Design a protein with these regions (language model features):
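Bacterial N-terminal signal peptides
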Residues: 4-13
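Periplasmic/extracellular electron-transfer cofactor-ligation site
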Residues: 20-51, 74-79, 103-110
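Sec/Tat signal peptide C-region and signal peptidase I cleavage site
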Residues: 14-19
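Extracytoplasmic electron-transfer domains, predominantly the class I c-type cytochrome c fold
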Residues: 54-101
Length: 112
């Protein structure tokens, strides 16, 4: 019985880790489809549009605002006139946000 319990826990933890990886993959796919024309969506490379910040640099501003997830669902838009408004359902918004958090650059020295 104990072996069965330990096996179940191990399987559950592996499945949980895989689901998180799958969520990150889904978030990246959404960003590639909707945003990569202007923004860099990965851990490296410059954005195709020099005025569009790479998503890996958002930690200092947007990602940790308490309402960022809600703004992704309500329709995220920018003051930049060429940027279209995007609206995500809750699952997609969470996948996008969690992927973006996973690729963030370390904070710059002297900042929290």
């Amino acid at each position: 019985m104990r072996c069965l319990l330990l096996s179940s826990i191990a399987l559950w933890s592996i499945t949980g880790a895989y689901a998180l990886d799958e969520e990150h993959r889904h978030g990246k796919e959404l960003l590639q489809k909707m945003c990569a024309r202007c923004h860099s969506v990965g851990r490296t490379s410059a954005s195709p549009n020099r005025q569009a910040p790479p998503f890996r640099s958002f930690s200092e501003t947007k990602l940790y605002d308490s309402d960022f997830l809600q703004r992704l669902q309500d329709g995220y838009s920018s003051i930049h006139p060429a940027m279209p408004t995007f609206r995500f359902n809750r699952d997609d918004a969470e996948a996008v946000l969690n992927y973006m958090k996973a690729i963030q650059e370390p904070p710059k020295p002297g900042r929290k």
